[in-house]
A protein has these predicted regions:
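Short loop/turn elements that form and flank the Walker-type P-loop nucleotide-binding site
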Residues: 59-60, 88, 138-140, 186-188
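Catalytic-core regions built around general acid/base machinery
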Residues: 81, 166-183
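The Walker A/P-loop phosphate-binding site
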Residues: 2-7, 12-111
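Short beta->alpha connector loops
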Residues: 72, 126-128, 197-200
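A short acidic, amphipathic alpha-helical/loop segment
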Residues: 81, 132-134, 173, 205-208
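Phosphate-binding/switch region of NTP-binding enzymes
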Residues: 176-264
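Short, flexible loop motifs at catalytic/binding sites
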Residues: 19-24, 29-31, 137-140, 151, ...
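Conserved inter-motif catalytic segment of the P-loop NTP-binding fold
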Residues: 69, 88-173, 259
C-alpha cells in the first residue's frame, strides 16, 4: 500500500472566540477615579526632570521607551535615574535581560553610585520568564526599568514557543495592569523600557510597541563619540521641547539642556 503525503499549507482552523457584549463599558473622564499620587512627580534632581514631565520628574503610572543605538548610553542613563530614586527611598527594580552578574559588577565598579539599585538578572529565569516577572512585579514598585524589551520578548518566545505578537500582547498587558495599580501594594508603577535602534537609525521593534507607550525618548551619540543627547519625540506628560546633552566621566553622568530647535 502506498501512502501519500499532502503538501502545501495546512488547512486553516476556525478559532471560536467567546464574546460577552455585556462586558463592554464606556466611560467619561468624570467616571474615572485614581489616587492623587498620580500627580506627584519622582524627581532625579538633574536637568532630565525638565523633559520628563511638565511638573518636573517622572510621573507615576507611565510607561516610556528609551531607544538608541549600541553604546549610546541608554542603560547608563536609566541606572543613573534609578540610583537617584533609590537614594530617595523609592522602590525600584532594574530588570537586566542583557547583562549577567559579572558584567553588572564591572559596571558598578566603574559607576559606584549605581550599586544600590535592586536588580533582577532575567537570564537566570529564561525558562519561566512569564511566571518570574508576574511574581516580581506583583510585589509593587514605584519604577521598573526593562533592559531590554527585545531580550524579554525573545526569552518569552523561546520559553513558550509562541509568536512575537503574542509576546508583545503579554508584555504590554502586564505593564498596563501595574500602571493602574494592579499589584499587591497598589503601586502605580512607572516603566522605563530600553530598546535598540538599528544602525540606520530605525526603531528595532513593531509599531505596536512604539505607539502603545506614553513617551518615546531618543538617545543619540555622535559618530566621534564626543556628543550624546536625548530628547522626546512623544511625551504625554510634558509640553516642553528640550534636548538634554549628557556626558559620562569620573564615574558619573553629567547633564546640560538646550532647546531642541536650536542649531547644533
Amino acid at each position: 500500500m502506498i501512502s501519500t503525503v499532502k503538501r502545501g499549507r495546512p488547512t486553516k482552523q476556525n478559532v471560536v472566540v467567546e464574546f460577552d457584549s455585556n462586558s463592554v463599558q464606556l466611560f467619561r473622564g468624570s467616571d474615572l477615579t485614581f489616587s492623587d499620587s498620580l500627580f506627584e512627580p519622582m524627581t532625579t534632581g538633574t536637568e532630565l526632570d525638565v523633559i520628563l514631565s511638565t511638573e518636573g520628574g517622572v510621573m507615576p503610572g507611565t510607561n516610556m521607551m528609551l531607544a538608541g543605538g549600541p553604546g549610546s548610553g541608554k542603560s547608563t542613563i536609566v541606572l543613573d535615574m534609578l540610583s537617584k530614586f533609590t537614594q530617595q527611598g523609592l522602590k525600584v527594580l532594574f530588570v537586566s535581560g542583557e547583562m549577567d552578574e559579572i558584567a553588572h559588577y564591572k559596571y558598578c565598579k566603574r559607576m559606584p553610585h549605581i550599586d544600590c539599585v535592586q536588580t533582577l538578572f532575567l537570564k537566570n529565569y529564561s525558562n519561566n520568564v512569564k511566571e518570574t516577572l508576574e511574581f516580581i512585579f506583583n510585589e509593587g514598585y514605584d519604577v521598573i526599568a526593562i533592559d531590554s524589551i527585545a531580550e524579554v520578548l525573545e526569552m518569552y518566545k523561546d520559553a513558550y514557543r509562541t509568536t512575537e505578537s503574542a509576546a508583545e500582547l503579554w508584555f504590554l498587558g502586564l505593564q498596563d495592569k501595574h500602571k493602574k495599580g494592579g499589584n499587591s501594594r497598589n503601586y502605580y508603577t512607572t516603566f522605563i523600557n530600553i530598546q535598540q535602534m538599528t544602525k540606520a537609525g530605525d526603531f528595532a521593534g513593531s509599531n505596536r510597541l512604539k505607539h502603545m507607550v506614553d513617551a518615546f525618548c531618543h538617545v543619540t551619540r555622535s559618530k566621534d563619540g564626543l556628543e550624546r543627547s536625548l530628547y522626546f519625540s512623544k511625551n504625554r506628560d510634558c509640553d516642553k521641547d528640550f534636548k538634554v546633552f549628557f556626558s559620562i566621566y569620573n564615574g558619573g553622568v553629567h547633564y546640560a539642556f538646550e532647546t531642541a530647535n536650536q542649531n547644533d
